[in-house]
Amino acid sequence: PGSGASNAAGGGGAGAAGNNSSPPNTAGSGGNGRANNITGSCVTYAGGGGGGSDSNAPQTTPGGTGGGGAGGNGAVGTAGTANLGGGGGGGGRGPSCAQNAGGAGGSGVVIARAPGTSGVVFSSSPGCVADISLASDRGQIAKFTASGTLNISDAGAGIPMSYLIIAGGGGGGTGAGAAAEGAGGGGAGGYRVSFNCETSGGGSSSESELFVSAGAYTITVGGGGNGATNNCGANGSAGSPSSLSGITSIGGGYGGGDGQNGGPGGS
C-alpha cells in the first residue's frame, strides 16, 4: 500500500508494486493487477489504488489495472471496483480534510472450476450470490460475489478443483489541508490461483488444485476496507480476507494518511 506524502505513492497490485510519486507534483499510480481466464473470459483482478495529489497536479492519478481506484487530485479518492479486489485511491491535498477522504477498497471474489470430465455438479445454497455456469470443456464454474456455500455432488471418489481467490482491497488514506500532503492508495486484495499454471500475486508460484469430494464447502468473500474520512492524515482500513475450504487470500493493506506509512497486505 502507498504512503502519504506531498504527492503520495500508489498501492501495490497483484502483478506489480505501486509507483512512487515524481516531482514536481505527480502522485504514484497503483500497481497493476493480474489477468485470469478461469471463467472462460479474460478478466484482470487486484489492481492497487492510486496515490493522492494536490490540486496543481496535471491529472488524477490512475489506479492499477484490475479495479484500482484513482487517487484524488485535491479531492476524494475513488473506490476500488467491487468483486475485483482493487485498492481504494488515496485522498488528495486540498482545502479541507472532508474533501480529501480516501476511497474504499473493492470487495473480493471466489471462483471454483471443475473439469468437464468429472461429471461433478455445482450448486449454491438458497440466498447465496453465486453464478453457476458451464465452461467450454463442459466443466462447471461457480463464481461467488458474496459469502455462501458451494455444494458439490456426483464427485465420485473425488476430483481436482481449480480456484481463484481474491480478497478485499485496502482503503485509501485521508489527505490533509492545503499546506500538507496527499495520502497513499490502498493495496489490492490478495490473489491466489491454481488454474492453468498461472502464478499467484506477488510473484508466488502456481498453487496446487484442491482435491474435493461431494459435500458442502464454505465460501468467504472479503469486503473492501473503508477509505479514511474526515480526520486529517488518517489511515484507511485493510481489506478482509477471502477463503475457500481453508485456502485463504489476505486482504489488501491500508493506504497511509498524510505523512503515514501504509500497512502490509495480500498483494
What is each model feature region?
Residues 1-267:
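Low-complexity, glycine/proline-biased repetitive segments and flexible coils/loops
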